[in-house]
C-alpha cells in the first residue's frame, strides 16, 4: 500500500486545518520544500500536496514551490487545491507532477472531469470530500446536494485513475478515518481509492491495508504533531 505524507501550503508555509476550516489552522516552522526533503530522506516515494491558496483563488498560486519540490526530489506527487481549468492541469503536469486532483470543479461540472480524463490519461485523480454522505465543494465552504455514491456512479466511467476520499468530519482531527464510508466508496469505484482524513496511528495504516480496492492512505497532522513517527510509518510501506 502507498503512503502519502501530506503537505498543505498556505502563504508559502506548511499548515494543517481542522475539518477544512481556514480559521482553525496550525502553522509549522518547516518550509514545504524542507518538509518534502524530510519525507524523501526517510524513504517515502509518494507525496500529497494541497495548495490551500489555490483552493481559495482557483489559481496555481504555489506552483513555484511545487516545481522546486519536483525538481529537487524524486517523488511521485499528487497535487490538488482549486484546479478549475485545463490550463492549470497542464501547468502541473508540465512541472512534473504525477497526478492532478480535481475536486470542486469536477463536482460542479462533470464535463470538465470527462474532458480532463480524456486529455490527460492516467494523470487525473478525482477528489471527493464528503460530510455526512454529501459532497462538499469550494474549499469545503459549500455543501452540495449530491450524495457521494450517487455522484461516483455517474462519473465512474470517465477515466479517473485514482479516487481520493476525504471525510471532512475526520480531517485534521486524528480520530481515525471513516473506514466504513471509505469501504462503501471503494466497493463502487472503478479506480483505486486513497483514504484521507483523521489518520491518528500506525493501527489506522494497518487497518487500511486489509481493505479491498484501497491503493493508499494520506497522513498529515499526525506526522506534524508527532503522533506518528516517520521511522515507524516508513516500515508500513510496500509501494
Curated annotation (Swiss-Prot):
The active site is at residues 8, 129. The keyword Isomerase applies. SUPFAM superfamilies: Ribulose-phoshate binding barrel. It is found in: Cytoplasm. GO terms for cellular component: cytoplasm. Keywords: Amino-acid biosynthesis, Cytoplasm, Histidine biosynthesis, Isomerase. It comes from the Bacteria. InterPro entries: Aldolase_TIM, His_biosynth, HisA_bact_arch, Isoase_HisA-like, Isoase_HisA-like_bact, RibuloseP-bd_barrel. Its EC number is 5.3.1.16. Its main location: cytoplasm. Pathway: Amino-acid biosynthesis; L-histidine biosynthesis; L-histidine from 5-phospho-alpha-D-ribose 1-diphosphate: step 4/9. GO terms for biological process: L-histidine biosynthetic process; L-tryptophan biosynthetic process. One of its GO terms (molecular function) is 1-(5-phosphoribosyl)-5-[(5-phosphoribosylamino)methylideneamino]imidazole-4-carboxamide isomerase activity. It catalyses: 1-(5-phospho-beta-D-ribosyl)-5-[(5-phospho-beta-D-ribosylamino)methylideneamino]imidazole-4-carboxamide = 5-[(5-phospho-1-deoxy-D-ribulos-1-ylimino)methylamino]-1-(5-phospho-beta-D-ribosyl)imidazole-4-carboxamide. Belongs to the HisA/HisF family. NCBIfam families: 1-(5-phosphoribosyl)-5-[(5-phosphoribosylamino)methylideneamino]imidazole-4-carboxamide isomerase. This is 1-(5-phosphoribosyl)-5-[(5-phosphoribosylamino)methylideneamino] imidazole-4-carboxamide isomerase. The gene is hisA.
Amino acid at each position: 500500500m502507498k503512503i502519502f505524507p501530506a503537505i498543505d501550503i498556505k502563504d508559502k508555509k506548511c499548515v494543517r486545518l481542522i475539518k477544512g476550516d481556514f480559521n482553525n489552522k496550525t502553522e509549522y516552522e518547516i518550509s514545504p520544500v524542507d518538509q518534502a526533503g524530510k519525507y524523501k530522506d526517510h524513504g517515502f516515494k509518494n507525496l500529497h500536496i494541497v495548495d490551500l491558496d489555490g483552493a481559495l483563488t482557483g489559481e496555481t498560486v504555489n506552483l513555484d514551490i511545487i516545481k522546486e519540490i519536483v525538481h529537487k526530489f524524486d517523488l511521485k506527487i499528487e497535487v490538488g487545491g482549486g484546479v478549475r481549468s485545463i490550463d492549470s492541469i497542464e501547468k502541473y503536469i508540465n512541472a512534473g507532477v504525477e497526478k492532478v486532483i480535481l475536486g470542486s470543479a469536477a463536482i460542479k461540472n462533470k464535463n470538465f472531469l470527462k474532458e480532463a480524463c480524456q486529455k490527460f490519461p492516467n494523470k487525473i485523480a478525482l477528489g471527493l470530500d464528503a460530510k455526512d454522505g454529501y459532497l462538499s465543494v469550494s474549499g469545503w465552504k459549500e455543501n452540495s446536494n449530491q450524495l457521494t455514491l450517487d455522484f461516483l456512479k455517474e462519473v465512474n466511467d470517465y477515466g479517473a485513475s485514482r479516487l481520493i476520499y476525504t471525510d471532512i468530519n475526520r480531517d485534521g482531527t486524528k480520530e481515525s478515518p471513516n473506514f466504513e464510508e471509505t469501504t462503501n466508496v471503494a466497493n463502487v469505484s472503478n479506480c483505486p481509492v486513497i483514504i484521507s482524513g483523521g489518520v491518528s496511528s500506525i493501527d489506522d495504516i494497518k487497518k487500511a491495508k486489509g481493505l479491498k480496492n484501497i491503493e493508499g492512505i494520506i497522513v498529515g497532522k499526525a506526522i506534524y504533531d508527532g503522533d506518528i513517527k516517520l521511522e515507524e510509518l516508513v516500515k508500513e510501506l510496500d509501494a
